[in-house]
Amino acid sequence: MEQKKLKQLLSEMSLREKIGQMIQLTGIYFDDDAVLTGEVGEDQPPQWVTQYAGSVLGMIGAEKLRGIQKKYVEAHPHHIPLLFMADVIHGCRTIAPIPLGQACSFHPELVRKMARHAAAESASEGIRATFSPMIDVSRDPRWGRIMESFGEDPFLNGVMGTAMLRGYQGEEGKDPAGNKKIPESGIAGCLKHFAGYGAVSAGREYNDVEISQRTFREQYLKPFRMAMHADPAMVMTAFNAVDRRPVSGNKELLEGTLREEMGFSGTVISDWGSIGQLEEQNVVSSQKEAAEAAVRAGVDIDMMSPAYMFHLEELVKEGSIPTSLIDKSAWNVLVMKNRLGLFENPFAGMQGEEPLSAEAKKTALALACESSVLLKNDDMLPLKPERKVFWGGPYVESRELLSRWAIFGRYDDVETIREVLKARKMPVRFLPECEILTEEERRLWQAENCRIQDSGEQDKEIPEICVNSGKQYATLDEIEPEDTVVLVLGEHEAQSGEAASRAFLDLPEGQQKFFDAVAGRTSHIVTVILSGRPLDIRKIAEKSQAVLFVWRPGTMGAEAVVRLVYGEETPSGKLSVSIPWCVGQVPVSYWDVKTGHRMVETNPENRFTSRYMDIPNEPLYPFGFGLSYTEFTITPPIFEKQEREDKIDISCKVKNVGEVPGAEVVQCYVETLCAPVVRPDRELIRFRKIFLLPGEEQKVKFTVNRKELAFYGENMELIDGDVQFRFIVGNSSRSEAGSILYAF
């Protein structure tokens, strides 16, 4: 629709119609089978709200949504279409690894490609907007939502978030009137959670955030600044407060920082109920005040709180807020719908890609392989196909390779590891399965409430893992000291995700006992770990000859595990988040700021240093770390001839000196050598994943904009000169191939 006609439409809409565009309801008000991802209050929306609500979340199914849309558009006075949204976090029907795992691929183009498949599958089922990507920097694995993040590094979050966003929104063009258009096979993306939510205190869900303005702006806002280049359709407000001011009522942050400073021009949507929760946070005394605070702050859509639906109309009529605020927010929603082409075709995209296409599964498999990180390998992997091996652990026969956020994924789309091994006729034997969780743990984690769709109309519970009397199992007593055992262990999917904070990061009790029993029979153990977060795996690593961390790998997870273990694929993942030595270290990250009383290698026993007395300072495995089945060398960096004063060109060479093809991630970090404020130890500023054949060498060139080196000074002024930096290249945050100094 032309801008002129869109403005005319807005001018003709009634107050209730405009407010309706600012209200998002859950699908349960339209269909009984809608997916709930939050709490529903006791107050039912007024009839006019369900008639005029601008968007709905948690519904899927082209035929169903087509019927709802048709009825809604016909009944609406101005025939404005609904916008169906959902949490498509790491795939719609074809499920990719969790975002934390995807970041370990260090392959943004593959992440973009997978997001395109997710968008096409979503659009074909009627979903035209997703609440993803989440680019909350997170250093605390106790926080369950770290699984949705791209990890602890601001730059990596920005790169991966931008790639995923571009995948969702597709190759945007323009209509004849010059309006930006998301293709029918695309969906509107949403950057979240703005901002600082990954820094919740103690890793506890929905908790407060206490960080300095300098850290907030330099680390936690950086991914959002970077992703603005991809023109996000939406930004979601965080539950938390920043500097004790809840985001959903923070005009300075939403209007000043997000819109004016960052240049965001899309739609701001609240998280589920966060506007109403302003009252719980005691910054307002009523839902009416909450509605006024949020609309003045610039929140365009109220997701599932009573504030807007019950109080905005009254606030306008009594003169407490001007109609211009309503017009502004309603306009932002209409522009987003126009960008999606819904005015021309309210059913746009509903006849698109079939789910689980060969290409989608191929991409999901590639991403599952590249997301997996080989943490330890004492000449154990890869296994030879003809080698007799025992396989055990609850995930050998489980289809639970998805996650709590794979809300439209189906277990019957997932092969088990046992099925993959059997299909290849490998000489393997299977050990009796232990449960993923004990009964007590299942009650604690409410695992019985963790549900996912099957191929029918109804949901089904996560299947129990139990010994099938029709299958042949070996006993632990049959394991000899020289035998090799592959154990596939990990968290239950209910143990990570939203509302899944953990104080302890150990494996479930029964699995740890199972591991110890096997370790009592043989030392030749390969441990494959599935998880939505870093775990405390120190005891596992000590008794394993190889450790492969595969996160929650998705639909093609079983195939990926088998390929990696037997060397059909070479591991190339690098950690997007540090694996702590133990939970006492967290929050932990490689970019911690420098301190006095630094611990030095030449005097490790010095008590009066910044150290733990009972554990190392360093994590068990640092950010950027990951092994391969081949070896690489990286030369020290050099400066290229400077073509422009505002750019710095740094290059090095990487060579595969091993015997098999593989990929290395060359990482470039920058260290500020002297500044008026304390700076991070180092910061990732560029990376490049290079695939090389044995003996092959390739030059890697990094171009860095000088403005990227700027930081905030004593009075929060930007410092962009008279500073010396050290650029470091290597293959992890703690591995240096060389460095070079630069001053500007």
Walk through the language-model features, giving the residues of each.
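Glycoside hydrolase catalytic-domain context in secreted enzymes
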Residues: 1-714, 719-735, 744
